[in-house]
Amino acid sequence: MYPHLTGLGIHDPKQIERYSLRQEAHKDVLKIYFHKQKGEFFAKSVKFKYPRQVKSVLVDSGSHKYKEVTEINRNLTLVIDELNKITKPAKTTEVDVKEKILSDLRHLEKVVSSKIAEIEADLEKLK
């Protein structure tokens, strides 16, 4: 189900709690944190370093100047996709969205009704 994580030696992906990604020089550093086990003071974590891919990009076609740029390693993007499936919450369903919109609408109706009553009361005071 998670072939790239398994390839990194992570055999129980459900134990993953979160991850962090940072760049150091010409490497991306991925750190994966696991849920803290009973009796442990700190959660276990593992660190992986991926070299950044270097590409030459044409900056000025008139003078044919190129600039070296780095980008994230393709394998790392695949690992991050799998990590996002584990750590990010599932998208809300259409029914949940509809219920939220209806709830917001009912709340707005109450706010508007209250404001109208307040303005009418202010008008009565002016008479």
UniProtKB/Swiss-Prot annotation:
User: In this record, what's one Pfam family?
Assistant: DUF3461
Cited HAMAP family: UPF0325
NCBIfam families in UniProt? PRK13677.1 (NF010213)
Query: In which family does this protein belong, per the annotation?
Result: Belongs to the UPF0325 family.
Protein name, as recorded? UPF0325 protein VIBHAR_03240
Q: Which organism is it from?
A: Vibrio campbellii (strain ATCC BAA-1116)
Q: What is the lineage of its organism?
A: Bacteria, Pseudomonadati, Pseudomonadota, Gammaproteobacteria, Vibrionales
